[in-house]
């Protein structure tokens, strides 16, 4: 029997991150986030080796990552958390999955706590 010579075509995975909420408040810069992803994504074990395998585009309040190489949503979440920590935004903004391969940055829900001192007085 002859060996199968047909190769599988690489399927492009698309990940979208909606950064509209923190961008509207002026605490988040989508352009610097996209640049951070470009500078830190590893392809085949090397940083800065994107080539044609991974493309990162920033379109207003949406950052899109298209990959034909091995890339996961968990890795995108890891890099985003690292970016938020570096810019001291990790305490206020979180990375939330909305659908498969669709994410958004959202502020933590803060519930006002009543001071016990005011109740006692």
UniProtKB/Swiss-Prot annotation:
Protein location: Cytoplasm
InterPro entries registered for this protein in UniProt: Ribosomal_eL22 (IPR002671), Ribosomal_eL22_sf (IPR038526)
One GO MF term attached to the UniProt entry: structural constituent of ribosome
Gene Ontology cellular component annotations, sorted alphabetically: cytosol; cytosolic large ribosomal subunit
Keywords: Cytoplasm, Ribonucleoprotein, Ribosomal protein
Keyword Cytoplasm part of the UniProt annotation: yes
Gene Ontology biological process: cytoplasmic translation
Summary of subunit composition and partner proteins: Component of the large ribosomal subunit (LSU). Mature yeast ribosomes consist of a small (40S) and a large (60S) subunit. The 40S small subunit contains 1 molecule of ribosomal RNA (18S rRNA) and 33 different proteins (encoded by 57 genes). The large 60S subunit contains 3 rRNA molecules (25S, 5.8S and 5S rRNA) and 46 different proteins (encoded by 81 genes).
Function in brief: Component of the ribosome, a large ribonucleoprotein complex responsible for the synthesis of proteins in the cell. The small ribosomal subunit (SSU) binds messenger RNAs (mRNAs) and translates the encoded message by selecting cognate aminoacyl-transfer RNA (tRNA) molecules. The large subunit (LSU) contains the ribosomal catalytic site termed the peptidyl transferase center (PTC), which catalyzes the formation of peptide bonds, thereby polymerizing the amino acids delivered by tRNAs into a polypeptide chain.
Family: Belongs to the eukaryotic ribosomal protein eL22 family.
Note: Present with 60400 molecules/cell in log phase SD medium. There are 2 genes for eL22 in yeast.
Protein name, UniProt field: Large ribosomal subunit protein eL22A
């Amino acid at each position: 029997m002859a060996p199968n010579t047909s190769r599988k075509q690489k399927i492009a995975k698309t990940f979208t991150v909606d950064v509209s909420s923190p961008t509207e408040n002026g605490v988040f810069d989508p352009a610097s986030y996209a640049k951070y992803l470009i500078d830190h994504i590893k392809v085949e074990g090397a940083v800065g080796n994107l080539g044609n395998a991974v493309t990162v585009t920033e379109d207003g309040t949406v950052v899109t990552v298209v990959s034909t190489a091995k890339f996961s949503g968990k890795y995108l979440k890891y890099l985003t958390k690292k970016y938020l920590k570096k810019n001291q935004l990790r305490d206020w903004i979180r990375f939330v999955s909305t659908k498969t391969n669709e994410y958004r940055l959202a502020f933590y829900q803060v519930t006002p706590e009543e001071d016990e001192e005011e109740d006692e007085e």
